[in-house]
């Protein structure tokens, strides 16, 4: 079979030999997991959040997640991060959405692949870069407000929601708190303004 050449007269092998990946900026890739469960009485939906141990957003509550290793798929990274940060294993994750807004992470350009799972309630244990891992009851979720509560540690997170004019709710925006706010574990009430993105 004849080697096909491009307009510069190069075969694919020649092209790849001189190709320089450094000519293009490369974003980092992360994963986040939206893990939901019903409580044992099947009367209330809960969401799993971790408390960040380090910057950025130190001490703030967020979805479990982290960076994808160079030799792993996003699914493999999601499984690994979920186990490292919460102790949960053997959870079937479904890919939900890819977030690629250029300024979504203060460190660098990051593309995030989000996964979702609905599981039976089970114990969680913080590890790796998670300071704590807790189930929060979703006590209110409507067009105006989202309220999450963990009664055991007396934590309430309240978001005032604002719609943008579009069509689809970004389920992950509400799990990230606004930058620069420290949240003490024993805080009885946390007020935070948040914009829910629609697209």
For the regions a language model picked out, list residue spans one by one:
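N-terminal strand-loop-strand
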Residues: 12-62, 75, 90
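Entry/capping segment at the start of metal-dependent catalytic domains
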Residues: 4-14
